[in-house]
Amino acid sequence: MSAARRTVPTPPSGGQIVPLRRLDERRASLAEISDEALLASCGVGDPAALGALFDRHHAAVYRLISRLLRAEPAETDDLVQMTFLEAWRSAPKFAGRGTVRSFLYGIAANTVRHHFRSSRRRRLAHEGIPEPLPSRAPDETVVRAQQIERLSLALEELPHDLRAAYVLCDLEDLPGVEAAHVLGVRAGTLWRRLHEARRALRDAIEGGTP
């Protein structure tokens, strides 16, 4: 996976967000401000606050979107931009339930879901065809590589709701209650989706084990 690009979004007002690293005169003060305070500042139109939030969280948001949507880096970067611009617009709605990162994760998950619906694109197909297994028993390294490849393919084939539950809980290590809040579902619904996702992935790995 390509590294997240640090292209800072421009807020709807048209003023360029200035990354934290460029705000020498405010670096110390911004570094000491909590995420919640920065988000509140976004809510009253402070572009520097959004720049600081972007610097703190863009890598995590990029990683999450990359796991939810297998796409070209430029497309993923566009969705990251959309996520932070929506955070700028939605900042006044933050009610303090959960962390600011989970707030951003929720926006990112919705952005990906809307992307699926609006574009109606199919998942990008993997290039190339896996080579057939050798006639002799493969060594442990080869078997492990094949299992990882099957897991990656199976994760892409999961319905979006199941994949989102698995990514948030098992890859991002979010607590169940927080992951449910991010996805806007009840805890029971989250656990059902996570159970189905884990079972599907386990079957994909075990079903192809030599």
What do the predicted segments below correspond to?
Residues 1-44, 48, 52-56, 120-187, ...:
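Intrinsic, short, N-terminal disordered tails of RNA polymerase sigma-factor systems
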Residues 68, 77, 91-97, 101, ...:
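A short, glycine- and basic residue-enriched loop/turn
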Residues 89-96, 106-127, 144:
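Arg/Lys-rich amphipathic alpha helix in sigma70-family domain 2
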